[in-house]
């Protein structure tokens, strides 16, 4: 993600897929793949083979990553439009409202490297 507006701990709204319309908390960001893992969203069942620790085997549910373009930040329970402004201090994320006004949402520090 070159410009990331979604960080770990943010609440996001799912725009597309089987879980469209649901909200969840971001558990991790996979920057190199432009994907995020969201709590309770895109849950997949994985079968664990039998072993000495698990003589019967078992099935576990895990959250699979979804593309960052399929989620949007959720502010006050609704998906929010975010714009990025570059200032002397760094990048600022602004929440844009339908009436044309905007409000500072978060300041993003520049990553080195």
Curated annotation (Swiss-Prot):
Pfam families: KOW (PF00467), ribosomal_L24 (PF17136). Part of the 50S ribosomal subunit. This is Large ribosomal subunit protein uL24. GO terms for molecular function: rRNA binding; structural constituent of ribosome. Keywords: Ribonucleoprotein, Ribosomal protein, RNA-binding, rRNA-binding. One of two assembly initiator proteins, it binds directly to the 5'-end of the 23S rRNA, where it nucleates assembly of the 50S subunit. Gene3D superfamilies: 2.30.30.30. SUPFAM superfamilies: Translation proteins SH3-like domain (SSF50104). It comes from the Bacteria. NCBIfam families: rplX_bact (TIGR01079). Belongs to the universal ribosomal protein uL24 family. It comes from Chlamydia felis (strain Fe/C-56) (Chlamydophila felis). The gene is rplX.
